[in-house]
């Protein structure tokens, strides 16, 4: 079968009406396969299908995904426990960090403040900011958070298609995998449950990037084309600066896949020389170096300031056997229908693998990985849970469950390819289209599909408190939600303090998980309901707390103190305001301190009457102190930045947050890598002085074009 390059199909009607750009895009997508057939050692024949048909597979997944998340596309805050937090974080990043030309900075928004992107990078915030610029500021930040979550979910389908094609699945099988990936819904992250139930927006944004990274790394192993190396590096960098835990899980997943690849017997008629393995290892190493270079602007500051951090992952992880039973018998990661289909496909592929069926022959040395990588990854993650210290292992096994599930569904695509092996492309693509229609008509196949909608407004009392805080909390101050079991969730949002921080655009003493880690966290907000208000008073003054929000009966004891007054009493919810001005410093005997100036990264006090000033700023290495204009060495007391004064007289103390040498060096390294990989080759090609590799790359493109003219059908 041949295809003429003039646009006329030898076996069908002419296709001149199809736009040339669409045809070329389809051809590029169809090139997502390995360059050599594992059984013959030669280039497989290309499909004679027009380019537009090759877009059908990824397109089905995109359409299904958009339909499933249509409830959050119209605007407003999406459902999700943590969604208000991401709104507040993105708002501060857009206005105070990116708006000032920085990639990171000090954010006082939560707890006692932290470097905004020290633990989890700015990937999600950058995407939200880009969308805001693209819409000329007409879209509010709550809507942008919904769009970012929807983008991460919808993009999962074409990313899964790309990954499956890299593993040698046909277009039909890869399309089925793309649709099935939308049915993976894990509350710990990945899918609709994690995105619109818990609100793990950055995690979901990282999911398609993880799949693209794995697919590109597979191609790096198989193909000498340097473009795969670049794609793998860029995608890996994107995962790392978006969700660090996902990057670690990606490494674990690819290690499992490579172990399966290495352990798979070679059936190739034309055996590759040992040097091919060395060159593949070189390309993988190059991809790793490029990824580190591209992400140096964030990785170097992370390495410079790794902690300390309090424990934040406090939930219980069940034993391995119990977890497996939950995966198989409950809706932990998918509906029971999808679980049954996955197990049936996995069993069929395992039998084909044992008997050496031709159904898996096209997968080459990836056939074992397609069958076993999902279960093996889950085992590895549980092993790491018991080995890695602190929260790292716990986060990996919880956040990695969804990625293991995405590997589990690969056998479904293999079975789909087998079912349509003798059908034409136009007929075969009806299978993923039908599956997509079933998912749309029966959304219950996707756990938590009902959460993809606009969040329900909280009770009027909480909305009133938000308006009061917006009007009365000064920029240098913060409010504290007084936690009480059974009271916090009675107003609608699971985290009312996060909703108040978002709605009032105010800082809060309440910390939030691993993404807002402060070098010091007093956890005072959890003790305010039980300790004596007189004992809490100096701590609240040091922390800059100007307002308390909590149960009316609980705050009655604070309202009796001379320094507090009620500004809102609405049923069982009360807001108290501190009468004195904010000092953001610990009160000491006979010491008089006044806050002269405040900005997120520069604070100035006037103090007298003591020989030290204990500030309300965490003792973070990038905070620098000066006394009367002279730089001094910063000290710390109880985790707080402390200035040792020369005497008890009047002094001006200033704290300044400065970018470190690692920040500047990281940006410089990234710029050098970007210039070396993208800038210099372009200049050399334009001058006609490019290296031989550039010529070989061009020859490879020409060879691809020649092969595309030969035609064929890959099913």
Q: Predicted regions span which residues?
A:
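Short hydrophobic helices that act as membrane-entry/anchoring signals
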Residues: 16, 20-34, 268
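Membrane-embedded transmembrane-helix bundle of lipid-linked glycan/lipid transferases
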Residues: 4, 9, 25, 37-469, ...
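Extracytoplasmic
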Residues: 78, 82, 96, 158, ...
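Beta-strand-rich ligand-recognition modules
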Residues: 619-622, 627-671
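Short, Lys/Arg-enriched N-terminal segments with co-localized hydrophobic residues
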Residues: 710-712
């Amino acid at each position: 079968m041949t295809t003429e390059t003039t646009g006329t199909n030898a076996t069908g009607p002419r296709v001149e009406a199809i736009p040339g750009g669409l045809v070329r895009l389809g051809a590029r997508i169809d090139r997502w396969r390995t360059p050599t057939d594992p059984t013959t050692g030669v280039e497989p024949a290309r499909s004679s299908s027009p380019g537009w048909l090759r877009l059908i597979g990824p397109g089905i997944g995109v359409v299904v995904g958009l339909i499933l998340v249509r409830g959050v596309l119209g605007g407003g805050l999406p459902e999700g426990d943590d969604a208000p937090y991401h709104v507040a974080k993105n708002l501060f990043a857009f206005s105070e960090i990116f708006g000032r030309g920085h990639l990171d900075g000090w954010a006082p928004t939560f707890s006692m403040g932290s470097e905004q992107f020290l633990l989890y990078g700015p990937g999600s915030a950058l995407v939200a900011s880009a969308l805001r610029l693209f819409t000329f500021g007409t879209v509010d930040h709550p809507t942008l958070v919904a769009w970012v979550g929807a983008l991460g979910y919808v993009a999962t389908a074409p990313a899964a298609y790309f990954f499956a094609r890299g593993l040698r699945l046909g277009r039909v099988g890869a399309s089925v995998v793309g649709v099935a990936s939308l049915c993976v819904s894990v509350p710990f992250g990945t899918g609709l449950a994690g995105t619109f139930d818990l609100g793990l927006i950055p995690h979901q944004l990282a999911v398609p990037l993880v799949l693209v990274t794995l697919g590109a790394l597979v191609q790096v192993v198989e193909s000498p084309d340097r473009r795969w190396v670049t794609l793998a590096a860029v995608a890996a960098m994107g995962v790392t600066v978006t969700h660090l835990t996902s990057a670690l899980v990606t490494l674990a997943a690819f290690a499992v896949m490579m172990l399966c690849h290495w352990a798979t017997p070679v059936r190739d008629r034309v055996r590759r020389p040992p040097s091919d393995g060395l060159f593949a290892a070189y390309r993988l190493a190059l991809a790793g170096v490029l990824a580190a270079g591209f992400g140096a602007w964030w990785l170097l500051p992370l390495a410079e300031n790794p902690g300390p951090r309090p424990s934040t992952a406090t939930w219980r992880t069940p034993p391995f056997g119990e977890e497996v039973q939950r995966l198989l018998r409950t809706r932990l990661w998918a509906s029971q229908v999808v679980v049954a289909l996955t197990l049936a496909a996995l069993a069929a592929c395992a039998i084909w693998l044992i008997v050496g069926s031709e159904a898996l022959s096209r997968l080459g040395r990836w056939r074992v990985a397609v069958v076993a990588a999902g279960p093996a990854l889950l085992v590895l993650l549980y092993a790491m849970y018991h080995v890695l210290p602190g929260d790292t292992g716990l986060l990996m096994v919880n956040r990695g469950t969804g990625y293991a599930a995405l590997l589990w569904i690969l056998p479904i695509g293999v079975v789909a390819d087998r079912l349509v092996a003798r059908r034409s492309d136009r007929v075969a693509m009806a299978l993923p289209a039908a599956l997509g229609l079933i998912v749309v008509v029966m959304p219950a196949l996707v756990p938590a599909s009902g959460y993809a909608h606009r969040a329900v407004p909280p009770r009027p009392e909480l909305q009133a408190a938000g308006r009061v805080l917006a009007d009365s909390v000064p920029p240098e101050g913060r409010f504290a939600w007084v936690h009480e079991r059974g009271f916090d969730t009675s107003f609608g949002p699971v985290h009312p303090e996060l909703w108040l921080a978002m709605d009032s655009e105010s800082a809060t003493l309440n910390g939030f998980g691993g993404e807002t880690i402060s070098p010091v966290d007093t956890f005072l907000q959890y003790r305010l309901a039980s300790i004596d208000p007189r004992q809490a008073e100096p701590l609240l003054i040091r922390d800059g707390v100007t307002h308390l929000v909590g149960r009316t009966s609980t705050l009655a004891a604070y309202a009796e103190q001379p320094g507090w007054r009620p500004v809102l009493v609405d049923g069982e919810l009360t807001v108290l305001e501190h009468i004195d001005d904010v000092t953001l410093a610990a009160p000491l005997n006979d010491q008089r301190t006044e806050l002269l100036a405040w900005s997120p990264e520069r604070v100035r006090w006037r103090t007298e009457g003591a020989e030290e000033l204990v500030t309300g700023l965490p003792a973070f290495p990038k905070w620098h102190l000066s006394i009367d204009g002279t730089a001094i060495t910063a000290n710390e007391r109880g985790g707080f930045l402390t200035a040792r004064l020369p005497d008890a007289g009047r002094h001006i103390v200033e704290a300044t947050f400065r970018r470190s040498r690692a920040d500047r060096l990281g940006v410089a390294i990234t710029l050098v890598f970007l210039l070396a990989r993208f800038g210099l080759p372009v200049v050399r090609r334009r001058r006609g002085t490019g290296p031989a590799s550039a010529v070989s790359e061009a020859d490879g493109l020409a060879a691809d074009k020649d092969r595309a003219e030969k035609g064929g059908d890959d099913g």
